[in-house]
Amino acid sequence: INKQLAILAQKFGNNLLAENNAFEKEIGVPVSSYPTFMTTCTDRAKREAAFKAYSSRGNHDNANDNKAVLLEIMKLRTQKAALLGFDNSADFILADKMAHDAKTVDTFLASIMGPAVAKAKEEVVAMQKIMDEDIKAGAVEAGAKIQPWDWAYYAEKVRKAQYDLDENQTKPYFRLENVRNGVFKAAEKLYGVHITSVSGLPVYNPEVKTFRLTNADGSLVGIFMADYLPRSIKRGGAWMTNFREQYVDAEGNDVRPIIANVCSLGQPDDSLHLLTIDEVQTVFHEFGHALHGFLTKCRYKDVSGTNVARDFVETFSQFNENWAFQPEILATYAFNGDGQVIPDSLVVKINNSLKFNQGFMTSELCAASILDMKWHELTSDTDWANFDVAAFESKVCKDMGLIDEIIPRYKSTYFNHIFNSGYNAGYYSYLWAEVLDKDAFEYFVQKGIFNPEVAKSFKETFLEKGGSEEPMTLYRQFRGADPDPAALLRARGLIQ
């Protein structure tokens, strides 16, 4: 079963890569540029075409169709779970995670989905008011209502109106190379590591940059490889990967890790690689994963660094995002071509805007998490031969209360995370980990965001331990209490 699953996962990924390339040929922009296109394209018909092409990837009944592939994957996963004595694949997968079972995850996601959808409905009202003005001006057909392909475009208009924030104002201050240096500065300030550029190391592509991380005494922490630029053969998304993990060898030597962050940031035709606010957060996010791998001090590689429970692994990446727009860190990297540091007024607007559109953002993420869980709560007696993927998705979305203007962040036929990347019954982990991340950051805020004692405790309690101890035990040691889920809702502006 495992061999068949590995082959099918690879096929799913290959099909999706082909579909991504087909999307670019049809629409004229790469998949990595889809969010920017949907935000800036003034032609509603083109936005609709792009949305429909994007949201139907892997679902064209052609050689790259993923419906049959994912159904075979689920059939085998349910069989495997049954053989191992579990009711479904979700309970099997979650047995050794922080959540422990599907019921706990379902309850958690429902507690997030309600406030998220309520906020999203408010956001629709605000966008519709602006669309109505476009209707009066003749720019949009009479009677038009906000559709999924309108959301990014009109959300940006609302953001400009409510926060007077235009990404064209911020991007000149977020040059990729400078943002990367800002990420490094934050790590140096928090954890005492020193990061320097190094040349002459073997790389798999000329665009990859290499860096050496050292402790204050000069001892090696690890080697970092930064692969941030879009390429035609690179799949979408962003991730951290280990070329070598930390461990102690048979002779007692501490073997240090080699880690890469891989992304597709900026526009292919932009030589300065100016980043959006979301892309800046991505750079901080992925380096949070890297720090988890670099700062670990474990004997065995199987529990070092990011080798932790799936619903714990995103804690440190998301936690690292909290420093992206702190004034002290912005001063180290956010300056334009003339060397001018980003003005305080713009920083205030950025931080105010971070809670903007969170009804949508949280709803689409939570919806994808619920879709993932419902797939993996299916049992081995499911009638796979007559299974209708579209009908299943529609019912799941209706049952969770998702509004028509939003679709899950990933639909099944291009949900690479759960069918090819090990996040099966685990996509909820981003939200689960965010509870820990936001609760921990609230503690930092109380004590001072660069408080050396708190940072030292965080490093020694969490980052150095990897997966060698129960995550909740470690969290309680650091925080002195269980994480508060309301911290996530507060951080996203879903509650006061």
Describe each region flagged by the PLM.
Residues 101-102, 268-272, 301:
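Short small-residue beta-strand/loop micro-motif enriched in glycine and branched aliphatics
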Residues 51-71, 453-462:
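A short, flexible low-complexity segment enriched in Lys/Arg and Gly/Pro that occurs
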Residues 265-284:
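Short pre-active-site segment immediately N-terminal to the catalytic Zn-binding motif
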Residues 1-33, 38-42, 71, 76, ...:
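Active-site-proximal, well-structured secondary-structure segments within enzyme catalytic domains
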Residues 43-57, 96:
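Short, charge-rich amphipathic alpha-helices with coiled-coil/heptad character
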Residues 178, 182-194, 201-207, 220-223, ...:
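C-terminal, non-catalytic "cap/extension" segments appended to globular domains
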Residues 61-69, 171-175, 271-276, 420-425:
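Extended, non-catalytic structural segments that build the interaction scaffolds
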